[in-house]
């Protein structure tokens, strides 16, 4: 009784576990369920009495009705799900039952078949045993008769052999004849002492000698195909002809065919077509010849195979030398840089086709020599691209010079230099990128020779980076420096605006372009070479030095242009007998106009730069030498016998305490410094010219007017107005020193004349 109850309890727990598994209740929730209250409907320890008691105490009638309705709904839902689960399991059970019934039927059929097979095997075993016992008596006799039959067939073959050989030769089946003779040769040689066999051997030797003569004639026929040659050599070798003689004749015949391919390659054509013809003709026939040669002679016993291989290696090296010379000569003729992919494809195809003969005959070095040719072609192409970049840069400079010399439309004079610089820089940079893209084809992954050590290392670092990019940047700097030569030395003068533009170009290269180009190159050509390369800082220093040299030359040139006007204006005038000044001389106005034009021109390419603080009214500033009272007090003493001190000494003492002005010092890369350098050169020339002339009263006054006019306009261009003030002060002072009658003009009159001018 207890056992029945335990079974029913186990069945309930099992069904309860299945339901929990169906509703997604895991084992992890058991621990939590143990702690639930007895009033939890879903709990394991649910107590209906406690639940109803609690529900009646805590809920109203309407709530009880709602709970009842909800519970009825849940019961119906659970009942529906339970029915669905039962139906699904029932269907699966029915399907499993059908499957088991079908398997039982199949196994029963297989058992019947196995029984039949076992009975058949037993019958076969019985028959085999009876046959073996029956034949056991006559087995030795049958074996003996079979041996006799085989011997008779061989003897019949030997007696019929001469007739068979003649028949095969008449039908042209030379290979069959050689095969028959090869089978019987050892037997005839073994039994040649017997008269019957000796006669057969003599007849066969005579027949095969005639066949050998026929094969030699065919072998020496130039019209024979490679397949016919191979067949002839193979048959002659089977006829025991000397192998070394056949090697020489075989190679001599092949030499003529390969030489004809080399003569066909002399005709010019497209580089890709040239390589295709060479590979399809010479290389293909060389491979076919080598393969046929090795299949014929490499199986010879003793040292014959080594001798044959050595002859083949020497033969291919001689002919391949001529082929490689033709290829290299044709590559030298490839000067067009328009489509580099054509050359790379040709080199790739050339390199790929050399792999076959290299594997067939490793000793001839096809692969090594082909790689050397590809490397030299790549190096030559880099040199061509470097030269093309140089020529492109020269062409750009020629275009810039023509643009600078051409007249400009009104209103567009100011934007010329900036546009030219941008166009020049962009054109050169784009050309460099184009060249890098073309050269990068040599290292493409689909190119066979790109995995060679040279193209992974030295080509990237020493070839492209150093030999192309660094060399071109150096060439740009050298070309720019050539414009710093003395104007007219080569018969043509360099436009000063070109010097200014090139200086800015080199400065831009120093600040950003060089780093960008080298970074782009290093990213595209990730070489594995560890050889030293030119650092970026060295190229930047070279570019900055070139920019400084060009800018110094520009300042010197513009300063000399203005100085030339001032020098002529001083040297061509009679300063002693000149009339009283009424206007500013035209040359001074021209000087101011030219310097203003240079200021505008420089401002298009360079930044303003730093200036020292100006005085409140620099244009109205009066220098000590401009003051008539100072001039009278300063220089009248030189004409008075009781002068307590020489005025020259006073002037020299004053110069000791003035700041030294370096006229030809290097300028900085800004507009103020450039204009300051030009004005220093101009005013210093003006000063030196004044020191060499003699002035009258009105000549001194004209110098005063001119210097005041220059002061009105030039102070705004320089970094320190005191520099202009000091130089002009010295000009007026020198004119006063050289004046025969130093009577300076009143400052107010000077200002009126300058304002009116």
Swiss-Prot record:
Cell compartments where the protein resides: Golgi apparatus, trans-Golgi network; Recycling endosome
Transport among keywords: yes
Pfam families reported for this sequence: Sec5 (PF15469)
InterPro entries in the cross-refs: Cullin_repeat-like_dom_sf (IPR016159), EXOC2/Sec5_N_dom (IPR039481), Vps51 (IPR014812)
GO biological process: endocytic recycling; Golgi organization; Golgi vesicle transport; lipid transport; lysosomal transport; protein transport; retrograde transport, endosome to Golgi
GO cellular component labels: cytosol; EARP complex; GARP complex; membrane; recycling endosome
Family: Belongs to the VPS51 family.
Subunit structure: Component of the Golgi-associated retrograde protein (GARP) complex Component of the endosome-associated retrograde protein (EARP) complex.
UniProt name for this protein: Vacuolar protein sorting-associated protein 51 homolog
């Amino acid at each position: 009784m207890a056992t029945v109850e335990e079974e029913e309890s186990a069945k309930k727990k099992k069904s309860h576990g299945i339901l929990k598994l169906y509703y997604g209740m895991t084992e992890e929730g058991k621990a939590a369920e143990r702690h639930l209250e007895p009033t939890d409907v879903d709990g394991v320890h649910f107590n209906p009495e406690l639940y109803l008691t609690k529900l009646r105490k805590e809920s109203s009638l309407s709530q009880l009705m709602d709970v009842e309705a909800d519970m009825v709904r849940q019961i119906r839902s659970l009942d529906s799900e339970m029915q669905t689960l039962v139906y699904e399991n029932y269907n699966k059970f029915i399907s499993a039952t059908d499957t088991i019934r079908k398997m039982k039927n199949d196994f029963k059929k297989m058992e019947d078949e196995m029984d039949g097979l076992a009975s058949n095997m037993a019958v076969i075993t019985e028959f085999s045993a009876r046959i073996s016992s029956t034949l056991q008596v006559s087995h030795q006799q049958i074996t003996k008769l079979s041996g006799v039959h085989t011997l008779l067939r061989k003897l019949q073959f030997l007696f019929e052999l001469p007739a068979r050989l003649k028949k095969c030769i008449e039908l042209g089946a030379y290979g069959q004849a050689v095969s028959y003779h090869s089978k019987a040769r050892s037997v005839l040689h073994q039994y040649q002492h017997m008269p019957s066999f000796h006669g057969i051997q003599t007849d066969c030797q005579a027949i095969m000698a005639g066949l050998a003569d026929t094969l030699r004639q065919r072998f020496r026929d130039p019209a024979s195909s490679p397949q016919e040659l191979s067949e002839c050599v193979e048959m002659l070798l089977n006829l025991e002809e000397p192998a070394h003689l056949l090697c020489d004749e075989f190679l001599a015949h092949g030499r003529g065919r390969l030489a004809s391919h080399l003569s066909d390659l002399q005709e010019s054509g497209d580089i890709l077509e040239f390589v295709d013809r060479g590979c399809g003709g010479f290389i293909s026939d060389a491979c076919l010849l080598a393969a046929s040669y090795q299949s014929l002679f490499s199986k010879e016993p003793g040292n014959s195979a080594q001798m044959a291989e050595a002859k083949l290696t020497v033969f291919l090296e001689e002919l391949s030398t001529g082929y490689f010379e033709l290829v290299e000569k044709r590559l030298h003729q490839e000067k067009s840089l328009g489509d580099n992919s054509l050359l790379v494809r040709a080199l790739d195809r050339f390199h790929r086709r050399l792999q076959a003969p290299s594997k067939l005959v490793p000793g001839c070095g096809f692969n090594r020599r082909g790689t050397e040719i590809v490397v030299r072609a790549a190096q030559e192409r880099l040199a061509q691209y470097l030269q093309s970049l140089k020529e492109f840069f020269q062409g750009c400079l020629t275009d810039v010079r023509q643009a600078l010399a051409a007249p400009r439309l009104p209103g567009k004079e100011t934007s010329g230099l900036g546009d030219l610089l941008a166009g020049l820089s962009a054109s050169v940079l784009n050309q460099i990128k184009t060249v890098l893209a073309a050269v990068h084809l040599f290292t493409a992954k689909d190119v066979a020779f790109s995995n060679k050590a040279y193209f992974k290392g030295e080509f990237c670092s020493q070839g492209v980076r150093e030999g192309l990019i660094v060399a071109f940047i150096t060439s740009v700097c050298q070309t720019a420096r050539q414009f710093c030569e003395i104007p007219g030395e080569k018969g043509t003068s360099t436009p000063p605006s070109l010097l200014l533009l090139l200086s800015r170009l080199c400065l831009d290269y120093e600040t950003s372009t060089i780093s960008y180009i080298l970074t782009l190159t290093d990213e595209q050509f990730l070489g594995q070479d560890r050889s030293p390369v030119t650092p970026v800082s060295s190229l930047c220093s070279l570019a900055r030095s070139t920019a400084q040299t060009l800018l110094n030359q520009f300042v010197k040139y513009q300063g000399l242009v203005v100085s030339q006007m001032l020098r002529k204006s001083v040297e061509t005038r009679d300063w002693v007998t000149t009339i009283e000044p009424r206007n500013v001389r035209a040359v001074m106005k021209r000087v101011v106009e030219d310097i203003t034009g240079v200021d505008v021109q420089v401002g298009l390419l360079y930044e303003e730069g730093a200036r020292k603080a100006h005085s409140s009214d620099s244009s109205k500033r009066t220098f000590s030498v401009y003051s008539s009272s100072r001039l009278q007090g300063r220089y009248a003493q030189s004409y008075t016998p009781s002068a307590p001190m020489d005025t020259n000494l006073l002037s020299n003492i004053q110069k000791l305490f003035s700041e030294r002005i370096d006229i030809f010092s290097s300028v900085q890369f800004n507009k103020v410094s450039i204009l300051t350098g030009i004005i220093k050169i101009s005013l210093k020339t003006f000063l030196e010219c004044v020191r060499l002339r003699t002035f009258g009263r009105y000549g001194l006054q004209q110098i005063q007017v001119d210097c005041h006019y220059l002061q009105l306009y030039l102070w705004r261009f320089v970094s320190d107005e005191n520099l202009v003030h000091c130089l002009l002060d010295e000009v007026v002072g020198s004119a006063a020193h050289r004046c025969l009658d130093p009577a300076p003009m009143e400052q107010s009159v000077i200002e009126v004349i300058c304002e009116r001018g």
